[in-house]
Amino acid sequence: MNSFTRALFDEYLRKTGWNRGNLYTNLTQSADEVLNLEIPSGINCDLSSIPSPNFASNWEIQMLPILNGSVSYLYSNVDLRLPQNVFGHFAQHQQKFQHLLPPYRHLKTELTDMGFERKPYLMFGKLHLPTAKLEAIFAKRISPPNNLIIRMCHTKRGILTSTSTLLHWQRDTGRSCTEILYSTDEAMIGFRKLWNSGRLQPSLFESANLTKFDPFWSVGAEVYYGALTKCVGASIGARLYSCANGVHNPYSVTCTLNPIVGHLVSTFATSHNDTRVLCSQFEFNLYSYESRLRLGMELFQRKRLLTNEDNHSDDIRQQGNDGVLRLSVSTDGDLVVAWNGQLRDFLYTVGTKVHMLSINPVFFGIHFQYSH
């Protein structure tokens, strides 16, 4: 998914009341989204359209260094219209720091209380050209605490074709969240579990009105096994986080360990008044003693609000362009700088990546997006 279709998928999860932050898969998402900057490769252009509340399409073309593209379609029985506010539309695409919600119970009548007569579902398909690679996603809310996501990928190289399928079942009870995965690649099966401590919210509607500053603890683990390759993997992790309540700045502190390879990672991320985000990540290997430190930052430029005093009216007009400056640097010498901005209905990204400790070439890219 690109940024536009991903924004629609996030809107689907938000409007159906699914707490994606309560998954072990997304334990370190707040820091990863800030540090792992995606720099456009060459010159890219996206054209997106939402002709109806339930249907969206996207065309993407890459002109440099090689010519390729893709076309994708998305359909859902959920109203996926993005906010009409200009800055809200921009922030929907560019916000990277994930504001976590407190754990809450899913009531039996949650979906009907939100106005859904049928169980919410979403279908997404993407065709890459000229490789004819096909991607598909099907997501359905089986019940208030259960969610199912099926991902498929079909590729063709000459006369050889391959199809892979990933089944991802999620069950969120508020106090804990269970994930079971199965992939046809290597016949891999995985199990993830996340436990939460702290005050459990009675429902989604009460968690949205949280005013008290209460930090929450989350502890989880995962294990997976590949039957074809006889490969085993495991990891454990913990997270301490707070929620945005209008008084205190939200933060997220995580620590994960892969005991097989001895890889230890700790992260810290915080957001200040939705205008700046600071993030750090420290990696250490218990066996080789190798380490790495990464720092990330986001600075948002807001539109200035000016009152028309000449005619003594209360009309407020906005001037200037929205934008966000992203910066990521590591002790390996990697420096990544990106600027995301909006000009009328166009979103653009300009970025570069430099390795300061070597003579490798500098990467530079431009990405344009238009939606209506």
From Swiss-Prot:
Keyword Ribosomal protein: no
InterPro entries xref list: Mdm10
Pfam family, one: MDM10
Compartments reported by the entry: Mitochondrion outer membrane
Membrane topology annotation: Multi-pass membrane protein
GO biological process: establishment of mitochondrion localization; mitochondrial genome maintenance; mitochondrial outer membrane translocase complex assembly; mitochondrion-endoplasmic reticulum membrane tethering; phospholipid transport; protein insertion into mitochondrial outer membrane
GO cellular component: ERMES complex; SAM complex
Keywords of this entry: Membrane, Mitochondrion, Mitochondrion outer membrane, Transmembrane, Transmembrane beta strand
Role of this protein: Component of the ERMES/MDM complex, which serves as a molecular tether to connect the endoplasmic reticulum and mitochondria. Components of this complex are involved in the control of mitochondrial shape and protein biogenesis and may function in phospholipid exchange. mdm10 is involved in the late assembly steps of the general translocase of the mitochondrial outer membrane (TOM complex). Functions in the tom40-specific route of the assembly of outer membrane beta-barrel proteins, including the association of tom40 with the receptor tom22 and small TOM proteins.
Domain comment quoted from the record: Lacks alpha-helical transmembrane segments, suggesting that it resides in the membrane via beta-sheet conformations similar to those predicted for other outer membrane proteins and porin.
Sequence similarity: Belongs to the MDM10 family.
Subunit comment: Component of the ER-mitochondria encounter structure (ERMES) or MDM complex, composed of mmm1, mdm10, mdm12 and mdm34. Associates with the mitochondrial outer membrane sorting assembly machinery SAM(core) complex.
Protein name: Mitochondrial distribution and morphology protein 10
Organism per entry: Schizosaccharomyces japonicus (strain yFS275 / FY16936) (Fission yeast)
